[in-house]
Design a protein with these regions (language model features):
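SAM cofactor-binding core of SAM-dependent methyltransferases
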Residues: 7-46, 57
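Class I SAM-dependent methyltransferase "Motif I" SAM/SAH-binding loop
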Residues: 12-16, 192, 236
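Short, conserved catalytic/metal-binding motifs centered on acidic residues
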Residues: 55, 193, 262-264
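BZIP DNA-binding basic region
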Residues: 222-277
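Acidic-aromatic/histidine active-site loop/patch
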Residues: 201
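Hydrophobic residues at beta-strand termini and immediately following loops
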Residues: 34, 116-118, 247
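Class I S-adenosyl-L-methionine
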Residues: 2-5, 12, 44-54, 61-178, ...
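Short, hydrophobic alpha-helical segments
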Residues: 205-216
Length: 277
């Protein structure tokens, strides 16, 4: 049995640590990197080489959000580049990036990258669509399969939410009595709304555990470090068989992956890429 407490995870852009909390609940030891919320600056941060098993984090998403009401500031792309730089410097076994659906692709050398969407409404009665990018040196892929969204879901908690703080905590899966001492009321709501829902974080943490502790599947890689076996055409990384172009969901159809591939063709994502330092 793998002792997860010996597996150091670096959290970038941790905020108030909701994604960190989910990984800690699953047994990982999480080290928090600098965050603007606490006066830190990732641009001045250089993680040590080879010390971290994995890296998790969600760079600021405002520039890529469909709810944005003003022109992009450029900060979003800069922070994505900083995330990729930290991955390249630290060289973990894997990295996981969480963001909004429109975020550009984030690539780093020597990693096979999987991209997929996940909805909080697959697991509870709150709907929140997010985009995940997972990079692995060994070619391992997370198994997170789309489901039907729970009917009559509550709207997700967001940074500018006007609902009570306690209600936002409930929607994010935080325990009764959770508080942020020293924060103004509006700052508390913004910090909680910006976090990764605990239920979603637990699913992602468990997916990492499953793929690294289950009997190993060896992926065939070519000299460019790319998986050579057939994969879904939408970029989610799931294997396909025969003449299929897209993977099937739990209902046995390919509509989710087909629609994602069509969106990608119509509006290709920009790519943030960092070379070896």
């Amino acid at each position: 049995m793998t002792d997860l407490s010996q597996k150091l995870i670096l959290s970038l852009f941790p905020g108030i640590g909701l994604l960190d909390r989910a990984f800690e609940e699953k047994g990982f030891c999480v080290v928090r990197g600098p965050d603007l919320l606490w006066g830190g600056d990732i641009r001045q941060f250089h993680p040590p080489y080879g010390k971290f098993w994995g890296i998790i984090g969600g760079p600021p998403c405002q520039d890529f959000s469909g709810l944005r009401r003003c022109a992009p500031t450029g900060n979003g792309l800069e922070m994505l580049t900083e995330y990729a730089r930290c991955v390249t410097e630290a060289q973990p076994k894997w990295w996981l990036l969480e963001n909004v659906a429109r975020v550009p692709n984030c690539d780093a050398p020597d990693y096979v990258t999987q991209r997929f969407d996940i909805n909080q409404g697959w697991y509870c009665d709150v709907s929140r669509l997010r985009h995940i990018q997972f990079g692995s040196k060994s070619g391992r892929l997370l198994n997170v399969t789309g489901r039907r969204v729970t009917p009559n879901c509550d709207p997700a908690a967001v940074a500018n939410d006007d609902r009570p703080f306690r209600e936002l905590c409930r929607l994010q899966g935080l325990p009764d009595g959770f508080d942020l001492p020293g924060f103004l009321a509006v700052e508390k709501k913004r910090a909680v709304g910006n976090g990764v829902p605990l239920q979603m974080g637990r699913v992602l943490a468990q997916a990492v555990i499953d793929v690294y502790t289950s009997p190993r599947h060896t992926y065939q890689l070519n000299f460019a470090g790319q998986v050579t076996e057939a994969r879904c055409g939408c970029g989610c990384g799931r294997p396909i068989t025969g003449k299929a172009k897209y993977a099937t969901n739990e209902q046995g159809d390919t509509s989710t992956c087909r629609k994602r591939a069509e969106r990608n063709r119509k509006s290709p994502r920009a790519t943030v890429w960092t070379a070896h330092g």
